[in-house]
């Protein structure tokens, strides 16, 4: 069994869960963005007095106009001072961990064989949740690398997201996956595209080099940006089947 975490602008999908079930996996698809699901299910995500979503375009109960990129306090943040808990990512990782707990309690699930995977922003959620000791394997898709505050090699000044963070050292120590990968004990399959803008090869391999073990793989299609092909879906199925 595993948790699936969708990407930015996306939603939980029944057909995707059916596909995974046909491969032999119980799964939960967390609808963190709060978009209405295609099946017109009335009961949907309600974040209450916090809002780690991408704004009212997707989430009807959004408290902000868009994605919160920094750790600064605002009227909807948890802490009144700069804090990791003011980051959307912390809330989304907490949602991921609650999804693990949900799977653990289902009668169809072997609680000793649970994994985590997700696409793009879901890959980032995967990276931040991968330290959970209950996980036996993880597979971030096109997202989840560290070092987003570092410019790309070759002197490409301004190619990082450093200006967004304001509290850079706090971000590096508590939010960037650079702080998480050294503590991930389970096997990792990093699935990406050769031309991906969100999980570039240099950041992937630099991140995987932080792992305290050698049980990791990288799978990429060629000449494509931010999407995966049938070979990568096969990698996910085989990875989860093994662990």
Predicted feature descriptions by range:
Residues 197, 201-243:
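Catalytic cores of secreted or luminal carbohydrate-active enzymes
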Residues 184, 190-192:
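Short beta-strand/loop motif that positions the catalytic acidic residue
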Residues 95-98, 235:
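Charged catalytic carboxylate motif
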Residues 166-180:
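Active-site nucleophile elbow and catalytic-triad environment of alpha/beta-hydrolase enzymes
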Residues 26, 113-115, 137, 187, ...:
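Proline-centered loop/turn at the N-terminus of a beta-strand
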Residues 1-7:
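Short beta-strand element of the alpha/beta-hydrolase
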């Amino acid at each position: 069994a595993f948790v699936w975490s969708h990407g930015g602008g996306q939603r939980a999908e029944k057909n995707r869960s059916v596909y995974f079930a046909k491969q032999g996996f119980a799964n939960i698809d967390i609808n963190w963005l709060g978009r209405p699901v295609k099946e017109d299910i009335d009961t949907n995500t309600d974040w209450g007095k916090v809002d780690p979503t991408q704004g009212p375009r997707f989430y009807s109960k959004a408290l902000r106009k868009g994605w919160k990129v920094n750790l600064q306090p605002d009227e909807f943040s948890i802490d009144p001072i700069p804090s990791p808990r003011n980051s959307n990512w912390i809330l989304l990782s907490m949602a991921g961990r609650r999804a693990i707990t949900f799977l653990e309690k289902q009668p169809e699930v072997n609680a000793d064989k649970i994994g985590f995977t997700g696409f793009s922003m879901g890959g980032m959620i995967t990276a931040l949740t991968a330290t959970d000791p209950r996980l036996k394997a993880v597979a971030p898709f096109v997202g989840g690398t560290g070092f987003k505050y570092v410019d790309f090699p070759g002197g490409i000044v301004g190619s990082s997201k450093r200006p967004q963070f304001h509290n850079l050292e706090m971000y590096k120590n508590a939010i960037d996956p650079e702080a998480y990968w050294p503590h991930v004990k389970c096997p990792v399959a990093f699935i990406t595209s050769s031309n991906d803008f969100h999980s570039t090869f240099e950041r992937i391999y630099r991140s995987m080099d932080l792992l305290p073990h050698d049980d990791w793989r990288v799978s990429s299609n060629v000449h494509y940006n931010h999407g995966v092909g049938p070979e990568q879906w096969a990698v996910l199925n085989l990875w989860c089947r093994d662990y």
